[in-house]
Swiss-Prot record:
One cellular-component annotation, GO: plasma membrane
Compartment annotation: Cell inner membrane
Family statement drawn from the similarity comment of this UniProt entry: Belongs to the UPF0208 family.
TM helices/strands, residue ranges: 46-66, 69-89
Organism, scientific name: Yersinia pseudotuberculosis serotype O:1b (strain IP 31758)
Magnesium in keyword set: no
Keyword list, A-Z: Cell inner membrane, Cell membrane, Membrane, Transmembrane, Transmembrane helix
The name this protein goes by in its record: UPF0208 membrane protein YpsIP31758_1444
Bilayer topology annotation: Multi-pass membrane protein
The keyword Signal is annotated on this UniProt entry: no
First-listed, main subcellular location of the protein, grouped into a coarse class: membrane
């Protein structure tokens, strides 16, 4: 079992890291077969946008029609909790260390950036998925679109 470097992260920091990871991860279709981040990001953004209004609508509808308050509150809390689950998953994923296969791929992309004359930041002692997202975002901006084909 791998030891995560940030086990002492609070739940609020995990949600913040999830939001940052969601903004950082490049939304490229070629990454979708390998990484679930594209799907989780799309669903989480959808949930952030539409679940709070749905929760309010459900709550007011149940109250206006004389329904019971308990199930209405439970449904509203469930609807508001869905985007939080996505942010939680993304936050936990962001602080997870890269497995050995992705670590090799991380170093190859980093090497391609340095070969292209781009300054690269020093490597963390244990690279995480967040550092991979930062690197991929930068590679998509500064390298040609075929850099993934060579890897």
């Amino acid at each position: 079992m791998t030891i995560k470097p940030s086990d002492s992260v609070s739940w609020f920091q995990v949600l913040q890291r999830g939001q940052h990871y969601m903004k950082t991860w490049p939304a490229d279709k070629r990454l979708a077969p390998v990484f679930p981040e594209n799907r989780v990001t799309v669903v989480t953004r959808f949930g952030i946008r539409f679940m709070p209004p749905l929760a309010i609508f459900t709550l007011t509808w149940q109250i206006a029609l004389g329904g019971q308050l308990g199930p209405a509150i439970a449904t509203a809390l469930f609807a508001c909790g869905l985007p939080l689950q996505g942010l939680w998953w993304l936050g936990k994923r962001a602080i997870t260390p890269l497995p050995p296969t992705l670590l090799q791929w991380f170093h190859e992309v980093r090497h391609k950036l340095s070969e292209a004359g781009q300054a690269v930041a020093p490597i963390e002692p244990i690279p995480t998925y967040q550092s991979l997202a930062d690197l991929l975002k930068r590679a998509f901006k500064q390298l040609d679109k075929t850099f993934l084909d060579d890897l």
